[in-house]
Amino acid sequence: ARKQINKLLYAKLGTNDVRKKWWNPQDENNEKNGYQQEKFKFKDYAKWTGDYIFMRIEEMFLTAAEASCRLNDDKGARLMLNSLMQERDEDYTCKKTGTALGKLTSDETGSLLEEIIIQRRIELWGEFGRIYDIRRLKQGFRRTADMGWPSSALIASTDTEDPESYAWV
């Protein structure tokens, strides 16, 4: 089965966000709480020819936004984030401030840093090792079937909520 975005993350996309086309909510193969991805397609299935993404300018914008935010330059961080997002959703405007993050990736604080991380998750979905961001941010995570995770990916026997645990790396 192809990878699917969970509905909770998909719901964070604005109504006019062009990235919504990266997933198909109508696909007959969707899991209960996930949507099939349309972001990556093979040019030639027989030869496995396709896109190999190493870094995009969008990642640079998001990295600069995060760095500015961590340096308490909320204005600069919002400028970088809003510049990128105007290419994705012309209705998007971020006015958030602060660097608070929840203990778990699903714990929302409403901070600017959290918004940058959410947009990073969406923008780089399927391209970059999300697990490295989770480790770097010192957050734990929780996977549930309600979030769209198949039973094989739930990691039920591992304490993923402890950000210091190396059992899930």
Residue spans of the language-model regions?
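Acidic/polar-rich alpha-helix caps and helix-coil junctions
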Residues: 12-169
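His/Glu-based metal-binding/catalytic segments typifying zinc-dependent metallopeptidases
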Residues: 1-8
